[in-house]
């Protein structure tokens, strides 16, 4: 198997695995916690989240593979990979905070940190591969929206 294809498959697989791990914290729509939260009228329907996140995780994995494909010997690559790993763990942490701990406040703290680390990752990736950085733009947009949604849910559920 071609090394680039293997790297791509492993990177996408890693991101999807983190997404799957995060989904274990996400309750079914009928769970008492989720149904008791007051949500804004513009809250997306529940069915929208899985396909959006799947696409985003595939794009994230592709971005990581592009950066790794430039070689580990560059300091910029190592910095980008570390930042990517941090934001990936913060992504997982949001599900654990918001749903697992049932805390919109903890979720908001986590998602703000996640947003910061996505931006830092994009900046680091841009030094190595502009296309890799651009692949993270939809992710940043979605997390920006999710941050505002999280903030609004916190306000509606004091």
Swiss-Prot record:
GO cellular component: membrane; plasma membrane
Name assigned to this protein: Tryptophan-rich protein TspO
Family listed: Belongs to the TspO/BZRP family.
Classification via CDD domains: TSPO_MBR (cd15904)
Keyword Protease appears in the UniProt entry: no
Function: Binds tetrapyrroles and promotes the photooxidative degradation of protoporphyrin IX. Can bind the benzodiazepine receptor agonist PK-11195 (in vitro); this interferes with photooxidative tetrapyrrole degradation. May play a role in the transmembrane transport of tetrapyrroles and similar compounds.
InterPro entries: TspO/MBR-related_sf (IPR038330), TspO_MBR (IPR004307)
Record GO biological process: tetrapyrrole metabolic process
Recorded superkingdom: Bacteria
Record's keyword annotation contains Thylakoid: no
Effect after changing residue 146 to T: Decreases affinity for protoporphyrin IX. Nearly abolishes protoporphyrin IX photooxidation
Localisation: Membrane; Cell membrane
Keywords annotated in UniProt: Cell membrane, Membrane, Transmembrane, Transmembrane helix, Transport
Transmembrane intervals: 5-25, 48-68, 79-99, 105-125, 134-154
Membrane topology: Multi-pass membrane protein
Gene Ontology terms, MF aspect: tetrapyrrole binding
């Amino acid at each position: 198997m071609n090394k680039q294809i293997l790297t791509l498959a492993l990177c996408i697989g890693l991101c999807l695995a983190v997404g799957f791990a995060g989904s274990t914290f996400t309750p079914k729509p009928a769970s008492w916690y989720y149904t008791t939260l007051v949500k804004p009228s513009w809250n997306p329907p529940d069915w929208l989240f899985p396909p959006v996140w799947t696409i985003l995780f595939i794009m994230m994995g592709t971005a990581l593979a592009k950066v790794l494909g430039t070689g580990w010997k560059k300091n910029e690559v190592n910095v980008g990979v570390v930042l990517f790993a941090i934001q990936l763990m913060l992504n997982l942490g949001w599900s654990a905070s918001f749903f697992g701990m049932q805390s919109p406040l903890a979720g908001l703290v986590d998602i703000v940190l996640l947003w910061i680390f996505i931006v830092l990752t994009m900046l680091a990736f841009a030094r190595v591969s502009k296309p890799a950085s651009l692949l993270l733009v939809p992710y940043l947009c979605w997390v920006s929206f999710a941050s505002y949604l999280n903030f609004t849910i916190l306000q509606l559920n004091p």
